[in-house]
Protein backbone atom coordinates (compact mmCIF):
# COMPACT_ATOMS: atom_id res chain seq x y z
CA UNK A 1 0.00 0.00 0.00
CA UNK A 2 1.41 3.36 -1.01
CA UNK A 3 1.07 6.13 1.60
CA UNK A 4 3.51 8.69 0.24
CA UNK A 5 0.52 10.71 -0.96
CA UNK A 6 -0.10 11.70 2.67
CA UNK A 7 2.62 14.33 2.54
CA UNK A 8 3.71 14.55 -1.09
CA UNK A 9 0.88 16.75 -2.38
CA UNK A 10 0.86 19.33 0.40
CA UNK A 11 1.67 22.72 -1.15
CA UNK A 12 2.83 24.77 1.86
CA UNK A 13 3.40 24.71 5.62
CA UNK A 14 0.00 26.22 6.46
CA UNK A 15 -1.85 23.62 4.40
CA UNK A 16 0.31 20.84 5.79
CA UNK A 17 -0.46 22.00 9.33
CA UNK A 18 -4.21 22.02 8.60
CA UNK A 19 -4.15 18.61 6.92
CA UNK A 20 -2.15 17.01 9.71
CA UNK A 21 -4.33 18.61 12.39
CA UNK A 22 -7.44 17.30 10.66
CA UNK A 23 -5.92 13.84 10.28
CA UNK A 24 -4.75 13.49 13.89
CA UNK A 25 -8.17 14.58 15.16
CA UNK A 26 -9.91 12.07 12.91
CA UNK A 27 -8.19 9.41 15.02
CA UNK A 28 -10.69 10.23 17.78
CA UNK A 29 -13.39 8.58 15.65
CA UNK A 30 -13.46 4.81 16.35
CA UNK A 31 -15.35 4.20 13.12
CA UNK A 32 -12.55 5.88 11.17
CA UNK A 33 -10.05 3.62 12.95
CA UNK A 34 -12.29 0.67 12.06
CA UNK A 35 -12.16 1.75 8.40
CA UNK A 36 -8.36 2.06 8.49
CA UNK A 37 -8.03 -1.38 10.10
CA UNK A 38 -10.38 -3.07 7.65
CA UNK A 39 -8.51 -1.54 4.72
CA UNK A 40 -5.18 -2.80 6.13
CA UNK A 41 -3.59 0.61 6.72
CA UNK A 42 -2.26 -0.63 10.06
CA UNK A 43 -0.31 -3.33 8.22
CA UNK A 44 1.59 -0.71 6.21
CA UNK A 45 4.91 0.16 7.89
CA UNK A 46 4.97 3.60 6.22
CA UNK A 47 1.55 4.39 7.66
CA UNK A 48 2.65 3.26 11.13
CA UNK A 49 5.68 5.54 10.82
CA UNK A 50 3.34 8.39 9.87
CA UNK A 51 1.34 7.71 13.05
CA UNK A 52 4.58 7.87 15.03
CA UNK A 53 5.38 11.18 13.32
CA UNK A 54 1.98 12.49 14.53
CA UNK A 55 3.28 12.33 18.11
CA UNK A 56 4.49 15.92 17.71
CA UNK A 57 0.88 17.01 18.37
CA UNK A 58 1.52 16.30 22.07
CA UNK A 59 4.02 19.17 22.24
CA UNK A 60 2.70 22.33 23.99
CA UNK A 61 3.11 24.47 20.88
CA UNK A 62 0.78 22.15 18.92
CA UNK A 63 -1.54 20.55 21.48
CA UNK A 64 -3.32 23.87 21.98
CA UNK A 65 -4.86 23.43 18.52
CA UNK A 66 -6.40 20.04 19.35
CA UNK A 67 -10.18 20.21 19.76
CA UNK A 68 -10.72 16.47 20.30
CA UNK A 69 -8.11 15.36 22.86
CA UNK A 70 -9.37 11.78 22.60
CA UNK A 71 -7.33 11.62 19.38
CA UNK A 72 -4.11 11.65 21.42
CA UNK A 73 -5.34 8.77 23.54
CA UNK A 74 -6.20 6.85 20.37
CA UNK A 75 -2.76 7.64 18.98
CA UNK A 76 -1.32 5.94 22.06
CA UNK A 77 -3.62 2.94 21.68
CA UNK A 78 -2.63 2.58 18.03
CA UNK A 79 0.91 1.74 19.15
CA UNK A 80 -0.47 -1.56 20.42
CA UNK A 81 -0.69 -4.23 17.65
CA UNK A 82 -3.55 -6.00 19.43
CA UNK A 83 -5.62 -2.81 19.51
CA UNK A 84 -4.87 -2.14 15.83
CA UNK A 85 -6.15 -5.62 15.04
CA UNK A 86 -9.17 -5.52 17.38
CA UNK A 87 -10.47 -2.13 16.23
CA UNK A 88 -11.38 -3.78 12.91
CA UNK A 89 -14.27 -5.44 14.77
CA UNK A 90 -17.52 -3.50 14.68
CA UNK A 91 -18.41 -4.49 18.25
CA UNK A 92 -15.19 -3.03 19.62
CA UNK A 93 -15.55 0.12 17.53
CA UNK A 94 -19.05 0.57 18.94
CA UNK A 95 -17.81 -0.02 22.48
CA UNK A 96 -15.06 2.58 22.11
CA UNK A 97 -17.53 4.98 20.50
CA UNK A 98 -19.96 4.48 23.41
CA UNK A 99 -17.22 5.06 25.96
CA UNK A 100 -16.24 8.32 24.26
CA UNK A 101 -19.90 9.35 24.26
CA UNK A 102 -20.20 8.66 27.99
CA UNK A 103 -17.01 10.62 28.59
CA UNK A 104 -18.57 13.60 26.84
CA UNK A 105 -21.61 13.19 29.10
CA UNK A 106 -19.23 13.53 32.02
CA UNK A 107 -19.42 9.89 33.08
CA UNK A 108 -15.71 9.20 32.67
CA UNK A 109 -13.91 7.18 30.04
CA UNK A 110 -12.97 3.63 31.00
CA UNK A 111 -9.23 3.34 31.55
CA UNK A 112 -7.50 1.38 28.78
CA UNK A 113 -4.07 1.14 30.29
CA UNK A 114 -0.80 1.83 28.54
CA UNK A 115 0.08 1.26 24.91
CA UNK A 116 1.54 -2.09 26.00
CA UNK A 117 -1.68 -3.07 27.75
CA UNK A 118 -4.41 -1.64 25.52
CA UNK A 119 -7.28 -3.80 26.63
CA UNK A 120 -10.79 -2.49 26.76
CA UNK A 121 -13.07 -2.98 29.70
CA UNK A 122 -16.82 -3.40 29.24
CA UNK A 123 -18.64 -0.07 29.60
CA UNK A 124 -21.42 0.10 32.15
CA UNK A 125 -23.89 1.30 29.53
CA UNK A 126 -27.17 0.20 31.09
CA UNK A 127 -26.22 1.58 34.50
CA UNK A 128 -25.03 4.85 32.96
CA UNK A 129 -28.21 5.16 30.90
CA UNK A 130 -30.30 4.74 34.06
CA UNK A 131 -28.25 7.43 35.80
CA UNK A 132 -28.76 9.78 32.85
CA UNK A 133 -32.52 9.08 32.91
CA UNK A 134 -32.69 9.74 36.67
CA UNK A 135 -30.72 12.95 36.24
CA UNK A 136 -33.14 14.12 33.53
CA UNK A 137 -36.12 13.31 35.76
CA UNK A 138 -34.62 15.35 38.61
CA UNK A 139 -34.03 18.43 36.45
From Swiss-Prot:
**Gene Ontology CC terms:** core mediator complex; mediator complex; nucleus
Biological process terms from the Gene Ontology for this record are: positive regulation of transcription initiation by RNA polymerase II; regulation of transcription by RNA polymerase II
Q: Where is this region: Disordered?
A: 115-139
A Pfam family the protein falls into:
Med31
Q: Assembly and interactions?
A: Component of the Mediator complex.
What this protein is reported to do is described as: Component of the Mediator complex, a coactivator involved in the regulated transcription of nearly all RNA polymerase II-dependent genes. Mediator functions as a bridge to convey information from gene-specific regulatory proteins to the basal RNA polymerase II transcription machinery. Mediator is recruited to promoters by direct interactions with regulatory proteins and serves as a scaffold for the assembly of a functional preinitiation complex with RNA polymerase II and the general transcription factors.
What is the official name of this protein in its record? Mediator of RNA polymerase II transcription subunit 31
Which organism is the protein's source?
Answer: Schizosaccharomyces pombe (strain 972 / ATCC 24843)
Organism lineage reads as: Eukaryota, Fungi, Dikarya, Ascomycota, Taphrinomycotina
